[in-house]
């Protein structure tokens, strides 16, 4: 984290062209960061309420700063070129619609030419799938596919830029995975676009599969389904649940199946469960 702060400070915050236009807010959900605030850098130590709690705390703090018009959400475990930030800044300054949002393309850090997602598409109002998944950016034929714009349902928080006045709701400060999905679900008015040269490199999600992530991933799918007004959403959720449990069981990943069953039960436990387990401390043990 400190290296990222220093890089952005050196290449952006201290440059005469940008130093009065940008602030860097670092919300730390873990151990305290030994880095002073000042010179456009604001370090905030926060209770660990997951990515959602951290990003929402940063959004609240950004709203307290005079003249802040736009915010970029960026994960601490990802990397991007400073040029991506500059391009996004220039684009949003010219955007006439306050609901215009820029989402960065995500590529794999261990295979940097392969795209994981360039925005995501809603399916059945709560399921989703990544657009341009596994597209090879080196191939000439990929250029035509990449330039084919589709209606994007939400953008990941590895790089997500928006007008602060376009936010109607804060995300729930729950310890969740896929909090960017829930945020997008609550802001369907956003006009989400992608830009060439705006991207972030992240670890492949397949390498992050774990019992806890399986628990959290199912909650991410379940919440939109439970609040959806779409007919048969609850039935589709049940079908999805049964399929995922069977797939995990038949591949002998019984601990993942148990985690999903536990997540399903907790999601149906009512409002009290969510209020009493905001940080999921007992679950994470």
Which stretches of residues belong to each language-model region?
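Short beta-strand-to-loop acidic/aromatic patch adjacent to the donor-nucleotide binding site
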Residues: 67-79
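Short, acidic, metal-binding catalytic loop of nucleotide-sugar glycosyltransferases
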Residues: 4-21
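Conserved donor nucleotide-binding strand/loop of the catalytic core
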Residues: 37-53, 61
């Amino acid at each position: 984290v400190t290296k990222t702060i220093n890089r952005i400070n050196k290449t952006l915050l201290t440059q005469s062209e940008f130093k009065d236009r940008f602030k860097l807010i670092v919300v730390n959900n873990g151990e305290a960061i030994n880095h002073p605030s000042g010179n456009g850098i604001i370090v905030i130590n926060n209770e660990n309420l997951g990515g959602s709690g951290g990003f929402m705390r940063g959004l609240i703090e950004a709203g307290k700063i005079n003249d802040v018009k736009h915010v970029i959400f960026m994960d601490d475990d990802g990397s991007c070129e400073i040029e991506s930030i500059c391009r996004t800044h220039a684009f949003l300054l010219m955007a006439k619609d306050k609901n215009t949002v820029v989402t960065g393309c995500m590529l794999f850090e261990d295979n940097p030419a392969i795209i994981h997602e360039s925005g995501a598409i809603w399916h059945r109002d709560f399921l989703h799938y990544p657009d341009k998944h596994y597209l090879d950016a080196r191939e000439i034929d990929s250029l035509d596919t990449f330039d084919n714009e589709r209606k994007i349902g939400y953008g990941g928080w590895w790089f997500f830029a928006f007008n602060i006045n376009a936010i109607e709701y804060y995300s729930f400060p729950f310890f969740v995975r896929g909090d960017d999905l829930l945020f997008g679900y609550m802001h369907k008015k956003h006009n989400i676009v992608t830009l060439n040269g705006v991207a972030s490199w992240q670890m492949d999600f397949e390498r992050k599969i774990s019992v806890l992530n399986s628990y959290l991933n199912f909650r991410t799918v379940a919440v939109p389904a439970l609040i959806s007004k779409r007919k048969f959403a609850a039935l589709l959720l049940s079908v999805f649940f049964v399929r995922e449990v069977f797939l995990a069981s038949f591949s002998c990943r019984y601990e993942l199946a148990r985690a999903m069953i536990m997540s399903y039960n907790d999601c149906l436990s009512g409002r009290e469960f969510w209020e009493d387990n905001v940080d999921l401390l007992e679950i994470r043990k």
